[in-house]
Amino acid sequence: MFQYDFSNHQNRHIRITDMPAEYFQRIQETTRKDPYYPVWHIAPKCGLMNDPNGLCEINGIHHIFYQWFPAGPVHGLKHWYHLTTKDFIHYEDHGVAMYPDTESDSYGCYTGMALKEGEKVHVFYTGIENEEMIPCTCYARFDGEKLTDRKKIVEMDPDQTTMNYRDPYVWKRDREYWMLTGAESKEHEGILMLYSGKQADSYEYAGRVRLLQNGQEAMLGYMLECPNYYEENQKGVLFCSPMGISSENKFDYKNVFSVVYMIGKPLDLSLIHISEPTRRSYI
């Protein structure tokens, strides 16, 4: 019986179209028969489900995408799968929404988000460009059914970051779009890259976001994944997942990758810093 060998990172870039039909059908049947297959929660028909992405609501329908490697329960070539729901109990399956089939994401469609603006829905995600695994930030439009107009909008700057560069988060303030992307600096410190743009699909580099505590820049591990930011009650709230973080408190940051939130003054977009953030272990 044919079976892919995923040891030593073999066969991690298999596409649905590459898999023998018999194999694909068999692993789906095996998954369906699993007595522990989730009843209420979203789960893939086979393979590996990674981050939920691009969450948005359109006319009372909630759209959920997630990263999917169909060939097996290991990390491999990521596609985006699409589901919808009205009540988060019953789900409608729409199949693969995004294949890794453009120049900008041919080696994987990774973490992203959706920004709803009136009738428009902008989607931002990390694409892996080639076999050298070079990351970039990509853009797509979502019309409620399909993701279209996919393209690269920001390139990784190899003079500033390592290959750890991913997870765009975008918001709009007044008439300008702002994007945060998590990264590892060349000095192996966790940093947030800030970009600005007049259009949702066009950005220029603005600088690194500094997290100032008592006038000193706070360091959080060697990489900051999945940044998320919003403002409320004259405060700026930043979420991120630091890699390589430690603490003198034996109860802090005991997950493999923890999540933290910081509450401080709103992000100063001219000086590019968040001042006096408090830091708490979130998970």
Label for each model-derived stretch:
Residues 77-82, 88-117:
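Blade-loop segments of beta-propeller domains
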Residues 51-72, 94-96, 110-130, 136-140, ...:
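Hydrophobic core segments of beta-strands in well-ordered, beta-rich domains
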Residues 272-283:
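Single conserved hydrophobic/aromatic residue that forms the stacking wall/gate
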